[in-house]
């Protein structure tokens, strides 16, 4: 497995995308028979992406200065080609032409509780918001569990794609966002939620 990364320009600043590339068995790049087109993030050309023989799954999408955001590490491969598909989806989202993302996500990231919370985030429709308490109720947490839900939301490694910006305070105020409240306001404004 190879860790790949790229930077993508956006209204939030330069986004850092990190993924895991794994060679598909029987792929054209591997010389196997019966190769099929995959669902990787990128394009052909460097052995990564949809037709390059490797499937790339998104691990992280961070904004500049993000609390707990990914940082490029030694041994990671800079591979913008691996992220062609997600870059296009992000561009369409920021241009108002798309309301959802369809990208493969790396499995096994986060605790079981965090993954349950993140699944709720993925179910929040574009242009809608829910409270931290509503998320807690959906995962079966109550009372003090709201704090744990807030912590899990704050550790979401896939900003924008997994829309934690759609979670607000019970009183309608914007609270906590690893990328900063100004970016949360920008995203909700883009979706027509705040002016």
Predicted regions and their residues:
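Basic nucleic-acid-binding alpha-helical/helix-turn surface characteristic of O6-alkylguanine DNA
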Residues: 1-143, 194-195
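Helix-turn-helix DNA-binding helix
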Residues: 145-149
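Terminal helix-turn-helix DNA-binding modules in bacterial transcription factors
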Residues: 156-157
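Major-groove DNA-recognition helix of helix-turn-helix-type DNA-binding domains
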Residues: 161
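Short cysteine clusters
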Residues: 164
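…primarily DNA-binding HTH/wHTH and HhH modules…
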Residues: 170-195
């Amino acid at each position: 497995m190879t860790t790949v990364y790229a930077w993508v320009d956006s209204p939030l600043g330069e986004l850092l995308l990190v993924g895991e590339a794994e060679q598909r068995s029987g792929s054209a790049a591997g010389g196997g028979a019966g190769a099929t087109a995959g669902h990787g993030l990128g394009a052909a050309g460097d052995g990564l992406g949809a037709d390059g023989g490797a499937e790339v799954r998104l691990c992280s999408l961070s904004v500049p200065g993000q609390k707990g955001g990914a940082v490029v590490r030694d041994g990671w491969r800079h591979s913008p080609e691996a992220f062609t598909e997600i870059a296009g989806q992000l561009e369409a989202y920021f241009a108002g032409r798309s309301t959802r993302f369809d990208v493969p996500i790396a499995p096994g990231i986060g605790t079981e509780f965090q993954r349950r919370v993140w699944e709720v985030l993925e179910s929040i429709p574009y242009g809608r918001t829910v409270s931290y308490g509503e998320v807690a109720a959906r995962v079966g947490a109550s009372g003090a569990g709201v704090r744990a839900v807030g912590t899990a939301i704050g550790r979401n490694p896939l900003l924008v794609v997994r829309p934690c910006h759609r979670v607000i305070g019970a009183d309608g105020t914007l609270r906590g966002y690893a990328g900063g409240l100004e970016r949360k306001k920008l995203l909700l404004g883009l979706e027509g939620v705040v002016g």
